[in-house]
Each structure stands twice: as C-alpha cells, then as structure tokens.
Amino acid sequence: DPLSQLSSIAVNLKKINFLRNKKINKQKIKIDTLDNFVKKNKDLFKKKIDFIKIDTEGNDLKVLFGASKTIKKHRPKFIQVEMNYHYLFSGENLYQFAKFLRGYEVYQIMPFNNGLLKINPTRPENNIFHLSNFIFKKKN
C-alpha cells in the first residue's frame, strides 16, 4: 500500500528523499503504551503472551519501552520488529533493540521464504539495512 509508508508519527519524514514531494497530512491520534493497554484489558490477557509484533514505522523501540512490564511479566517467546529508513533519522539501531531485549537472540527474517538468519547486533555491518524484519527469540 503506497500510503502505508506515510503512516508514521516520525517527525522527520520530509528528510526521506522519495517522500519529500508527497503530500503529508497531519492527524491527531491518541496513543497508549502496551503496558497500559494490557493493564486496562486484563480480561483479554489472562493467558501468557507468546508473540508480540511491532511495526510502527520508526517507533518500534519506543513501543518496546512502553511494553517493558508486559515483556518482563510474560517473557514472550518471540518479538518481531521492523527496521526501515525511518531509523536513519531517529538514531536508533538494532544494537539498541538487542540491548533492551537481553535474553533474546536476534534473527533477520530473510525475504522470499528463505528462513531466518542469526544476527550479531554488536557488529556494525549488521546495523545497516534497507527494509528488514527481525525476530527476537527468547533464549532457553
């Protein structure tokens, strides 16, 4: 969907070359943390949370910070995040995700059903990507 790339609360969208000439509309929205959402909706979360998928166009790390209590309590087996060009302007990288998610191994989801590639997030070359999805798998 061509509009989904514009669906972001990132403040630096105009710095991204191919978005520079796009019409960007601003809309006020209400946001909340995952921790608050889980707390307000306890009936929905009686069972253990095993999987969290985050795709917030450049704000995934902030979402993780807002899910810290939920992650600590439920220790999901998998947490999936998306890394894309928005991170060039937010100053965030894969290493910061891995540092926050201690006790998890990092895997890049390879395109075209080519499986998972284990990644060492401390290596600089593993923090350079265009569009990638990563799975953080809880260590045993």
Language-model segment annotations:
Residues 37-140:
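Conserved acidic-Pro-Pro-aromatic motif
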